[in-house]
Amino acid sequence: MQEQYNPQQIEQAAQSFWDENKVFKAIADSSKEKFYCLSMFPYPSGRLHMGHVRNYTIGDVISRYQRMQGKNVLQPMGWDAFGLPAENAAIKHKTAPAKWTTENIAYMKGQLKELGFGYDWDREIATCTPEYYKWEQWFFTQLVEKGLAYKKTAAVNWCPEDQTVLANEQVEDGCCWRCGTNVEKKEISQWFIRITDYAEELLNDLDQLDGWPEKVKAMQRNWIGRSEGLEFSFAVEGKDERLSVYTTRPDTIMGVTYVAVATQHPLSLEASANNADLAAFIEESKKMSTTEADMATVEKKGMDTGFKAIHPITGEAVPVYAANFVLMDYGSGAVMSVPAHDQRDFEFAKKYNLAIKQVVQPAGDEVIDLEKAAFTEKGVLCNSGEFDGLAFKEAFDAIAAWMVERNLGEVKVNYRLRDWGVSRQRYWGTPIPTINLKDGSVVPVPQDQLPVELPTDVIMDGVNSPIKNNPDFSSIMFNGEEAERETDTFDTFMESSWYFARYCCPDSTDAMLTEEANYWLPVDQYVGGVEHAILHLLYSRFFHKLLRDAGLVNSDEPFKRLLTQGMVNKDGTKMSKSKGNTVDPQEMIEKYGADTVRLFMMFSAPPEQSLEWNDAGVDGASRFLRRLWALSYRHTNAGKVGELNIAELNGAQKALRRKTHETIQKVSDDIERRQTFNTAIAAVMELCNEISKFEDSSELGLAVEQEALEAATLLLSPIVPHIAHQLWSELGHSDNIVNTPWPTLDEEALIKDELTIVVQVLGKKRAELTVSANADNKTIEAEALAHPSVAKLLEGKTVRKVIVVPGRLVNIVAN
């Protein structure tokens, strides 16, 4: 064994061994218990960042640990390769997105290998390959035929100068990022998938996910947003149509003083035909961002349409306002407004001098001032005619019954969740496999014509998608007639919503998924950032249920256990290029070696918390590995290792062996159950401290030390696999440590022959006793009283009481 630890040499040797022997190749075997560990695949941006390193190290540690538990482990890796950043980079670097993406994948794959991650590279997928997206296209055509995918008009960001659609990221302060023109909202026809059909199941099945963080489940529950309420309608004075609204607060219906409708609502548009100011307001509203965050903070504006809505219970006529905070694609595009009991409605009413009518009062003695703010709590009805005096639940039921009885409304369950809009007016994505016929109808591309391949030899002009104006792509013959391909591409969340399943059978050419998928699925452990808590994880859960209902998978949920790792910070903030506080993983690997980087990542913080990058901490991790190497070097040069004869162990040997097995017990629990890898590492460091203090070069002493070093090496091998690979060999083993069983706990080794007992006199520590673990209370009491320090203190005093706490202390009361 060489004396000095040389990480670069050791790591290259270990990685070559793993590659040449295909150590991490996963083969389905029904006789073995499987474990599918998956980390969220990266976007191939060009280089790994420290967030990637943390994510993938956590996943690799779990995978290697489970392999040592004897499980058949699948840990794949691939590339979330489509998306807008590739288009932008291609424009900047004057290249094609495909070329840029392919080069990035090659470089980043090399980085992942240098970090020693145990991936089955034979299962590698890139979502931009036709072999992958063919099956996404095929599945979408199935959804179209089942009616689960449909087209409707929806608003997009539109640049009138460039005549192109912009992603939300391309709108800066309401202007086009490229030309600075004011961005407008434009209604265009787009594809949607009916995720709302699965809303109830998506909500209820969260209760099955015991291995998910509660905060993630809470975020999904809120996003799905189940509510029970009353749907009813207002007649419109002088018109046949009615205004349908939904409310979760039927108890406040008697306080409606106006109805707000979307600026794109038919009533708004009709009124604007003869009202130039209203028409201008509607045009202004088109430029607004409709993201939830922006809608929450935008100044609430409105204009009277001149129409009146007739209150269904009182018959009172109330004004109908076009309002910029009501969205046409949310519900019916109309909301009842109760300014006395809703703060947004209150502020709007104050602004436009609309009536404020109190219909709910506090149940207790609370005094409210409706001149200052709305009273939004539940209470008791007032000013509500026959419903006066009713509390919320009774009022809900009574008013709902009144409406239902007269066929004016119905009790409904509503969801905040909207159907998933999957159309993107971008180039670098999966072509949507549909054909637009001359008669206006739309048909899915026949299966034998899939995949619809995305042309990759393109020039990006920064304005239009290269396939929009490319007749070679868009113009086709269908059933002997001229037709046009759809030139939109899929939202890239489509690719990431089923990739976990395709890893199970990446080479299948005649089916989206094979039976092998049911061997591996569901994923046993998923690792990724909490920023994906809603969209990616919700869409993946939805897609998995679609796959199940198509007979392609047997399970209800895709991910059994979820670990959401924290961010990597430097100088107190998240690492980012714009802040200039990034650390290049490549530089750290070259300076310290991959094992040091991995060890620092796992030791510096619990996985779900943010990690603060610290150069001193990295140095500390490096020092520990050199120390571990030095301990092994000392041991291998100390002499002959004898048989581990437990019956002959002396006190010091028993103590080190006890520490070894205490460490095995703690590390096993920390990794398996608690997933607190930092405390697991701390425990092994403590063991190494005890090994360094153990100076017994007898054959039996070296046998105890050998067991301790083997345990330390095995326990650390998932975290620092390269040095562990080498040390295992140096400790005399010819087998591959990757497949070596996890160390077995010897419960007998934990039993102590002797105990240290604290002796207190009048509550103060005065001495320590070493007693047999089997000593009874009388023996312990006698030894405590006989201890020289204690006996001296008790001279001339009367012992009133002796309290023995077994295994811990003796307290003597005397005066």
UniProtKB/Swiss-Prot annotation:
GO molecular function terms noted in the UniProt entry: aminoacyl-tRNA deacylase activity; ATP binding; leucine-tRNA ligase activity
Enzyme Commission number(s) of this protein: 6.1.1.4
Major localization class: cytoplasm
BP terms from Gene Ontology: leucyl-tRNA aminoacylation
Lineage: superkingdom: Bacteria
Positions bound to ATP: 577
Placement of sequence motif 'KMSKS' region: 574-578
Gene Ontology CC, one term: cytosol
Pfam families linked: Anticodon_1, tRNA-synt_1, tRNA-synt_1_2, tRNA-synt_1g
Reactions mediated catalytically: tRNA(Leu) + L-leucine + ATP = L-leucyl-tRNA(Leu) + AMP + diphosphate
Coiled-coil positions: none
Motif ('HIGH' region): 42-52
Keyword Signal in record: no
Similarity annotation: Belongs to the class-I aminoacyl-tRNA synthetase family.
HAMAP family noted in UniProt: Leu_tRNA_synth_B
Designated name of the protein: Leucine--tRNA ligase
